[in-house]
Design a protein with these regions (language model features):
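N-terminal beta1-alpha1 ligand-phosphate binding loop
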Residues: 5-28
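Anionic-ligand binding patches
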Residues: 2-9, 53-216
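A short beta-strand-loop structural module common to alpha/beta enzyme folds
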Residues: 30-41
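Charged, glycine/proline-rich intrinsically disordered loops and linkers
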Residues: 39-61
Length: 216
């Protein structure tokens, strides 16, 4: 049996260094379990299901669906959760000019994205799927991001750094990318990858306290 006196764990179903950093800076050392889920296939299933109902999934539905797919994949891989443990899946995408954008993956695509988004306002949407004791809490957080009118030289240098390749929207708020964000309106932790207010709401929904998970 799990030790009832032990600090409960947060298990993070994500390989994102940013999500890990958010939790660590908030006093939590999570257990990281990378899901390996096929995100394209998971998204296509959602689109097909919505089409069968004569509708198109919303951006919030899409990111929450991918977040849950990641967490579910970890559960299906045989993750053993102790009493009090919580599993978190997350996914972020940028809504720009009516189009959802994920990670650029290459320098060339990063340059193309930034040439499109510089000087504009976009919405960074982060979906969360949080599992505890057989129950799910799902929710999304949307934050407005106002991009600077960055020069071609700076865009190319930022792309060459490799930093934004694995980031939704081809930018980071907390590192080099911070030079090119004029301001945000909303939750900064959500832009980085995980909304601490939303996670707190989920824990409270389950009858848990944030401080139960502090382990530093």
């Amino acid at each position: 049996m799990p030790d009832s006196q032990a600090t409960p764990r947060i298990v993070l179903a994500s390989s994102s260094p940013s999500r890990l950093s958010i939790l660590r800076s908030a006093g939590v050392e999570p257990v990281v379990q990378v899901s390996g889920v096929d995100e394209d296939a998971a998204m296509q299933r959602l689109i097909d299901e919505a089409a069968s109902q004569g509708r198109t999934p919303t951006p919030a539905e899409k990111v929450c669906h991918l977040a849950k797919a990641k967490a579910n994949a970890v559960l299906e891989d045989g993750l053993q959760l102790g009493e009090g443990d919580v599993l978190i899946g997350g996914d972020s995408m940028l809504l720009l000019d009516g189009e959802l954008q994920g990670k650029p993956h290459t320098a060339e695509e990063t340059v193309r994205r930034w040439q499109q988004q510089r000087g504009k306002r976009a919405e960074l949407i982060t979906g969360h799927a949080i599992y505890h004791d057989g129950h799910w809490f799902e929710g999304s957080s949307a934050t407005s991001v106002f991009f600077a009118d960055a020069s071609d030289k700076d865009i190319e240098a930022y792309a060459a750094s490799g930093e934004p390749w694995g980031c939704a929207g081809a930018f980071t708020l907390e590192a080099l990318g911070g030079w090119f964000i004029d301001r945000i309106e909303g939750d900064p932790s959500s832009v980085i990858g995980l909304s601490l207010p939303l996670v707190r709401q989920a824990l409270e929904h389950f009858g848990l306290s944030v401080s139960d998970f502090w382990n530093r």
